């Protein structure tokens, strides 16, 4: 019986700790650079809500727009990814070399997701195809 209570207590503590890692914040609590990015590419009135997540030392931010777009920022407000679900990622966010490549090689599709990884950039097209580029925007490969 003591073991069961100990396990239950551990589970409750774990759930409580996890709950504190993610919470809704005011738009004005975003880093200034993230606010500028949102204002540049959409209307602040389109923001549904903002979440702050804390997985490690630094928080990360997720901005959810009313049209189901999700924009992720690091603790400094640098863009990490934008997922527009089924609509095109706004122009000006993605490097021109990548948008030109997609227009030339995939003219019937558009970019719905853009992610900045540690050593590469990744885009997902409206047909589900994922393309990998180097940090300068040169095509590397199709992701499996």
Residue positions per predicted region:
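Interaction-mediating elements
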Residues: 20-144
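Bacterial Sec-dependent N-terminal signal peptides
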Residues: 1-25, 38
């Amino acid at each position: 019986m003591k073991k069961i209570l100990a396990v239950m207590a551990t589970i409750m503590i774990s759930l409580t700790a996890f709950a504190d890692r993610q919470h809704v914040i005011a738009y004005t609590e975003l880093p200034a650079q993230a606010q500028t990015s949102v204002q540049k590419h959409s209307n602040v009135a389109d923001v549904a809500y903002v979440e702050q997540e804390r997985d490690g030392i630094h928080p990360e931010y997720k901005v959810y727009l009313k049209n189901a777009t999700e924009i992720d920022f690091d603790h400094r407000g640098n863009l990490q990814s934008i997922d527009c679900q089924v609509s095109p990622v706004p122009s000006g966010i993605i490097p021109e070399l990548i948008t030109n490549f997609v227009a030339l090689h995939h003219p019937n599709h558009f970019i719905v997701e853009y992610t900045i990884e540690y050593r590469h950039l990744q885009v997902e097209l409206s047909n589900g195809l994922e393309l990998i580029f180097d940090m300068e925007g040169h095509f590397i490969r199709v992701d499996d």
